[in-house]
Structures are given as C-alpha cells and as structure tokens.
C-alpha cells in the first residue's frame, strides 16, 4: 500500500506571504539562511505579518548550504529556550531542511541524531509546535515533502531523513520570492528537480 502526504494547507500566488497573518499562536521562530531573504525585504515582511497575527517573533539566521548536525542542534536549543508554537522556515532547501530536523530535537531533546536516521522512525511531532515552510527557490520541493537532508561533516555523510511527521503543516509558495533567484541558481534548482524525479524512479525505499 502506498501513502502520499502533503501539507494540510498550501497557499500559492503573488502576495501569498501575507497568509502568515492568519496563523494562530503566541510565538514563532523564523529559520533563514545566508541573507537573501533579509536583503530583498521578505524577512522583514514575514516578521511584520507574524507580529500582526499577535505573535512574538525570534530569528534563527545563518543556516549554511547543506546544513550540518551542529547547526540543527544549535537551532533546536534556540527553540527550547524560546518555546515557539510555530516554526517558520524561509528560504531555499537548506533552511527548511534544517528547521525540520530542529523541530524533532526541540520537541524531543533526549532523542539522538542516530535514532532518526532510520526512515520513518521519528517520534510523533506537533506536541509543541506546527511547521510553516516558505520556499524561495524551485526544485527542492522540501516545502511539500516528508524529507530533509542533513550532513555530518565529521563522518563525511549526507543523511536523508524521512518521516511523514516532518511534512509541513502549511506551505506558502509566493512566486515573488523565487523571482529573486539568479540565473545560475535557477539552472541548479532545475537540475535538482530532475534529480528528484530520477531518485523516485530508482529508489529502493518502497
């Protein structure tokens, strides 16, 4: 038997970032990457919308490309201190992937990274927070999938984490964000999309 899981709500269209105003909660942490979302003004907009929704907002910035286990643990620690009920991941695949893993260790601080390497072995999430993904690139599709890729640089291994629990609750796909991509990145993410299609065909995880 197969299973196909998508976010509960997917908002698409120019200006859909404003949907953040409709989220209900007390605190939101926004996870972002290298600075493009701040540079183009989208981070400030997101924070303003969340505050308009009545939430206290904190940022976790600087998630690197191919996020590391260390970054994930730092983010989870920041979440445990702040205690958000919304995790908002914004940017390319890396900050969204990292935030998914942070989510696990925020809700289950005693869990080890080794325990979640096995596909579909995660503990039940949403005991503390829900997840909203806002992609700024095309190609990774992490905003609508049950997957995350985290790198252990000490071992030199990229770990694909897989569990339906980490499928976002809400995905906001606003094309205004993707329009900021340079041509080279557009090409790279196109290859990413093609690679995902090939992976689905040759995967032994059935």
Task: Specify the residue positions occupied by each region the protein language model found.
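Glycine/serine-rich anion-binding loops at beta->alpha junctions
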Residues: 84-100, 136-143
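ATP/NTP phosphate-donor binding region
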Residues: 1-86
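Acidic, glycine-rich active-site loops and adjacent beta-strand->loop/helix elements
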Residues: 63-67, 94, 102-105, 136-139, ...
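Short Gly/Thr/Asp-enriched flexible loops that form oxyanion-binding sites at enzyme active sites
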Residues: 74-76, 95-108, 144-145
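General beta-strand structural signal in soluble alpha/beta enzymes
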Residues: 11-12, 58-61, 88, 98, ...
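Structural signal for hydrophobic packing residues in well-ordered secondary-structure cores
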Residues: 24, 50, 79, 103-106, ...
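A glycine/threonine-rich phosphate-anchoring loop and its flanking beta-alpha core
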Residues: 107-206
């Amino acid at each position: 038997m197969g299973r196909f899981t998508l976010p509960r709500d997917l908002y698409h269209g120019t200006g859909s970032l404003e949907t953040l105003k409709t989220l209900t909660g007390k605190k939101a942490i926004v996870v972002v990457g290298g600075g493009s979302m701040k540079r183009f003004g989208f981070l400030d907009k997101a924070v303003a919308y969340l505050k308009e929704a009545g939430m206290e907002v904190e940022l976790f910035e600087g998630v690197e490309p191919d996020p590391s286990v260390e970054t994930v643990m730092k983010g989870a620690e920041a979440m445990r201190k702040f205690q958000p009920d919304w995790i908002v991941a914004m940017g390319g695949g890396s900050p969204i992937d990292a935030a998914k893993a942070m989510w696990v260790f925020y809700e289950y601080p005693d869990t080890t990274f080794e325990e979640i390497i096995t596909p579909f072995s995660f503990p039940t999430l949403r005991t503390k927070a829900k997840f909203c993904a806002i992609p700024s690139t095309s190609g990774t599709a992490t905003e609508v999938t049950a997957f995350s890729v985290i790198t252990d640089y000490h071992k030199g291994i990229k770990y694909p984490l897989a569990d339906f629990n980490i499928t976002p609750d809400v995905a906001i796909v606003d094309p205004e964000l993707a329009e900021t991509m340079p041509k080279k990145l557009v090409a790279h993410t196109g290859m990413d999309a093609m690679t995902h299609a090939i992976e689905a065909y040759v995967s032994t995880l059935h």
